[in-house]
Amino acid sequence: NAEVSWMPIMHMTMMSHSCPNSEVEKISADGTLYEGYIMFQMAQNATEYWDLKIDYTIDGVDYTMTSVIDVPASAKRKVNTFMGSDGVKYLVAYVDPHHPKVAVNDMVVGVWKMQDMMNFPVVDGYTVKIDPRMPSMGNHSSPNNVNATQLTAGNLYKGKLSLTMTGYWKINLQ
């Protein structure tokens, strides 16, 4: 049984910053398995890289380890950052489903705000509109989508994504 925390850091040419990440939580009764999420808003490149610092305490003894981690660019855009009308920088991420079906899919979305370069708390109490579009078919949408909302403060947002046929869909989150 350990107490665990982590801090991802992007080392850029002129600055360093973190990204949205959850607490690390114990998920096994014997204390040998922990989980959490990290939402990387940008990929590494030839001169800029991510590392992950993990702090943990076992039987009152503190330990720290830091390792460079691989964060390659994604083929699909799943993260967006934007400046809100309130002057706050927001980050929105498509989390799930990883393999959507022609059906009404359970959907998970994350919404965070940039408090400062190292802190990105979850935004509470918003509604995320789910608007799937099929560009090759006249940009039509689909019925039965359910906007994503939080079940409890501090958590990710859950909704329903309806896909009516196979093919390329663009999922707009508003």
Language-model segments: residues:
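Beta-strand-rich structural segments
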Residues: N1, K101-M118
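Acidic/polar, low-complexity intrinsically disordered N-terminal segments immediately downstream
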Residues: N1-T13
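Hydrophobic beta-strand positions in extracellular immunoglobulin-like domains
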Residues: P8, I38-F40, Y56, V111-K113, ...
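Short beta-strand and strand-turn-strand segments in soluble, beta-rich domains
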Residues: T13-N21, G138-N144
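Aromatic sugar-binding surface patches on proteins
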Residues: V24-F40, E48, Q150-K160, G167
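Extracellular Ig-like/FN3 beta-sandwich strand-entry sites
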Residues: N45-D51, V102-V104, G125, G154, ...
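Surface-exposed beta-loop interaction hotspot
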Residues: N45-M107
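Short, exposed beta-strand-loop hairpins at the edges of beta-sheets
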Residues: I54-V61, S162-M165, I171-Q174
